[in-house]
């Protein structure tokens, strides 16, 4: 059985085992293309936003942030400020990849008649004309037409026009949870190369299926479009918005969406995926979603936050998730990080919270990795937000937009609130 088939038939243990076997035997880009192909077949039956490509993006970034690994990552990632020990990072990277495959098998999938389409004609118009037609097709809710133009734009070696146009459209009305921007931005950063024909086509079908439902039929008043979509915009610094970003992490909202939205804005701003005035537009929407004034530095004092608002206690421990490499990760944490790991997994939230102000600089990589493990190796295999939020918060800390102590506190509180049994 192939990994793709295991995911679509709901074979959770099989999917985790197969992806584990592929490591070191297959090209990393092929592994990620297959996983994105499976993600594109996710049918979200309860809400309006499928999270399969969002969690794929988050786990891919988690693995990158844990350090280089040529068996799993196609390119060497930027050096992280928090360098995780190799004897922890490597099994944790593998376990995260296995957790992703497990999740993609656990979620709902389209029946073949209603899922992604592969036989779509593409027209050879100019790129600028194709970009305009792509936009108009989305606004007219004509998915197959939009897909045809997306395939044309995406077939470039560097599909910058597709990435930037999609991000701009997604920014117009991100909704009260930020989904409208979070999902397309996550998907576009994980778009497989057109060399992987079927995954490439399926992922763009998944994207256009979403955009025609979420993008406004008319551009909102006051929204500016960059007239140079053929190149990335200059990076935008968010250093002046640290209080808003930190507030989004403290007031993280339902399932952590405020923090996730903030991180996707920060990533798009840093990469130049959106222009500075689009960043401002998105930050304004984030502020509206939070619903409160940004907190001051004094209000965000970690000691005050711990005293002011206690975290949620567990009634019982969440179910553990067994993966080919989960045992190695747990064993490392029990043997080498017992103090932190035991406190994190205690039923009472305050047991770990009270040590956060005293965590030394050298221990932050362990705390971060332990929270990655806590989010991924516990709970339900269908759960996604616990992982997505954990990665988002630590990514903001990596960028220097929030303190490590705030990241650790709020990830811990979110996991205590939302990690459940199977």
What spans do the regions from the language model cover?
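Mature, well-folded catalytic/scaffold domains that follow N-terminal targeting or propeptide regions
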Residues: 1-422
């Amino acid at each position: 059985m192939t990994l793709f088939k295991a995911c679509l038939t709901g074979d959770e243990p099989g999917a985790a085992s197969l992806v584990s076997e592929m490591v070191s035997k297959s090209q990393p880009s092929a592994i990620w293309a297959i996983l994105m192909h499976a993600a594109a077949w996710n049918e979200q039956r309860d809400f309006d936003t499928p999270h399969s490509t969002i969690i794929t993006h988050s786990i891919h970034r988690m693995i990158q942030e844990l350090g280089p690994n040529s068996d799993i990552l196609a390119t060497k990632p930027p050096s992280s400020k928090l360098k995780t020990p190799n004897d922890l990072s490597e099994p944790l990277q593998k376990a995260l990849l296995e957790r992703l495959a497990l999740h993609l098998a656990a979620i709902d999938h389209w029946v073949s008649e209603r899922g992604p389409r592969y036989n779509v004609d593409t027209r050879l118009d100019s790129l600028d004309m194709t970009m305009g037609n792509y936009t108009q097709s989305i606004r007219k809710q004509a998915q197959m037409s939009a897909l045809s133009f997306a395939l044309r734009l995406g077939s470039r070696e560097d599909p910058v026009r597709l990435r930037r146009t999609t991000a701009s459209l997604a920014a117009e009305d991100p909704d009260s949870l930020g989904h409208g921007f979070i999902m397309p931005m996550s998907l576009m950063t994980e778009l497989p190369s057109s060399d992987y024909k079927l995954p490439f086509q399926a992922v763009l079908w998944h994207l256009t299926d979403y955009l025609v439902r979420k993008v406004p039929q008319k551009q909102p008043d006051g929204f500016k479009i960059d007239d140079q979509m053929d190149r990335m915009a200059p990076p935008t610094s968010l250093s002046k918005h640290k209080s808003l970003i930190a507030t989004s992490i403290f007031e993280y909202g339902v399932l952590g969406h405020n923090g996730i939205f903030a991180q996707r804005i920060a990533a798009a701003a840093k990469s130049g995926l959106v222009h500075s005035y689009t960043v401002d537009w998105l930050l304004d929407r984030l502020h509206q979603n939070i619903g409160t004034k940004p907190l001051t530095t004094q209000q965000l004092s970690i000691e005050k936050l711990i005293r002011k608002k206690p975290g949620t206690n567990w009634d019982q421990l969440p179910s553990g998730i067994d993966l080919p490499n989960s045992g190695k990760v747990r064993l490392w944490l029990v043997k080498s990080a017992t103090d932190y790991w035991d406190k994190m997994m205690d039923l009472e939230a305050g047991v770990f919270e009270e040590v956060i102000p005293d965590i030394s600089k050298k221990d932050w990589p362990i705390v971060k990795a332990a929270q990655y493990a806590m989010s991924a190796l516990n709970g339900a295999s269908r759960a996604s937000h616990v992982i997505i939020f954990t990665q988002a918060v630590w990514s903001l800390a990596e960028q220097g937009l929030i303190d490590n102590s705030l990241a650790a506190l709020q990830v811990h509180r979110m996991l205590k609130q939302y990690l459940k049994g199977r």
